[in-house]
Amino acid sequence: SELQSVKIDGKEAVCKERSPKDIIHRMAVGVRHAGDDGSASFRIPGLVTSNKGTLLGVYDVRYNSSVDLQEYVDVGLSRSTDGGKTWEKMRLPLSFGEYDGLPAAQNGVGDPSILVDTQTNTIWVVAAWTHGMGNQRAWWSSHPGMDMYKTAQLVMAKSTDDGKTWSKPINITDQVKDPSWYFLLQGPGRGITMSDGTLVFPTQFIDSTRIPNAGIMYSKDRGKTWKMHNLARTNTTEAQVVEIEPGVLMLNMRDNRGGSRAVAITKDLGKTWTEHPSSRKALQEPVCMASLIHVGAKDNVLDKDILLFSNPNTTKGRNHITIKASLDGGVTWLPEHQLMLDEGEGWGYSCLTMIDRETIGILYESSAAHMTFQAVKLKDLIR
């Protein structure tokens, strides 16, 4: 049989025949599924590409259920050396197990963020560790103070062999937390190495009035010490950071006011912030984590300066996971530079990386698998 014509409201519509060669088949890989390695769920993706081209994906391993800390949670890592086609057996960069007389379910560590020091290829992972606190949500049961019995701890691990093995946990709480804050943790996803070698992670903290605020922390000495300055915007949480030009950082934030992303700029590592023209206007969101990366002109096949963004492209519900591109520094995100990957409902978190000069990689919480990976050609997004 053959389709001869199509009528819409009584009028004949123009039909264009397409060859099978014109159809783009974009396959996805289920990196983590419920039940893998005995874990009930996997959440909170982070993704980077090492200097050697290795893909390193991090996430929460939530053994008992999908709920947030406090629970039995470790930071897991999956490693791919073939562009995301296959993934090695899961590693655990951060895992406390039974500690200080309390079971693993009272020593959860999660919401990871991962960073590649591009000058040394040292890989850093930062996460929140909660000791005790019953089984209440750590967001509300962490308190002011500094020691592990009162407040969540900010811990790191590093790898110097391309993500194969990891150091013991490094506790940096004393370096960056204000004792009056209830909770300090990273912005899940990824951090960056600036053009001058400074390492930067996004952060979020609940202040003394119980209001959450996004910001950054940074290291000038290859990760030995870390500093924080001021918040970027009040009532914001999970954020991602990029360097849009030398010394200029953009922070893209989940905003509890709902509806759209907040965006701020700093030229002094977070001492002062200014609102970006796109803030609360250009990028809609359902109040959810999102991903943002900067791809310099010399680092991509199009020879253009590009910002890439991904999130659930909606204001209600976590669905329609979409990658968007901006060619003007994030001022506009044109419809022709958007690609929807998954219209189904899921948890909605995602993280982007460049696999090579031609290909975007995304690890996200899809409607089909807890951790789903897809590779997307840059030219499919920006034609």
Language-model features: locations:
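Asp-box/BNR beta-propeller blade signature and adjacent active/binding-site loops
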Residues: C15-R383
